Every structure is written in structure tokens, then in C-alpha cells.
Amino acid sequence: PGSCTVYMARRSLLFSPADRPELMRKGPDSGADIIASDLEDAVAPAHKATAREGLVTLLSDPDFDPDCEVCVRVNSDPDVAEMDLKALLGAEKPVRLDSIMLPKAETAADIDQLVTAISEYNTERPILAICESAAGVLHAQEIAAHDAVDCLLFGAEDLSADIGAKRTES
């Protein structure tokens, strides 16, 4: 009696640029626990609309049903993220989208803003928040404590740039 929730381990994450949906289609073959299509840094501004269209085509394909978590990294700019969400969650056909990644999360208010935007489509998705700035690191505990946040990630490259650190090879 009762119910049991089974959680998949998140040991590995494979990113692919959203303007290359064929790479995401191959992602499950990598054995990664999460495959994430990146609409933010990996796609030039001039290609974002086309990237969204191709991504929605892939994620609404009934033949695309991998045995791993399917995530999309939306844009950090709220206006551009809204266009991402409209394409994904407002699509004519249902899309395979298990979670949404929020880059450059700096406070719990950033999470609130994304949750509100997602709720406009009468749905919920777990949020994978990326702390990529000094402010994000300072507020990591409040970000991680947000009910909608399922996972907290650390973005070393953008953090290094934010604090003016010089990356060195080891």
C-alpha cells in the first residue's frame, strides 16, 4: 500500500546547442542522466527563433522518448525566456520536457519570476538553477531552498568572469 516515488540519479549532464536539435536526438545514446538543450549561450541571438522551432519539433516528436531527463536551458533575460517558454509550453503539440534550467540565478526572486511565467501555461516543471555570479553564490542557500528548485548547479566560467578571476589550466 502507499506510493513510492523513484528519482533518477543526476550524475551526468550533456549540453547541446538548441540550434542543433539533431545533437539532442543523439544525446540519449551518450548514457547521460540529463540531456539539456541550450537556448541561451549556445545560440546566437539571430538564430534563437529558428532554434526554438527546431527544438519544439524534436520535443513534440512521439519517437523522441529517451530514458533520461530532458531539460531545456532557457535564456537568462526574462523577456527572451518568456519567448522560450511560449514556444515550448505553448506549443500546439505536447513536448517532452522534464525540467527547465535557469542560468544566472542570483536570488529566489529570479526563481519566483520563472515559476510565475511557467504557471501561465497551467503547468509546472522542476527548475535546475545555475549560480554563475558572485550574487548567485551568496544567495545559493535561498535559491536551493525554493520549492520549485530541484537541483542547484555552479557555473564556473561565468563566475570567473563576474569576479574578474583569471582561469588557469591545471
Give the ranges of each region predicted by the language model.
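Conserved alpha/beta-domain cores
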Residues: 6-170
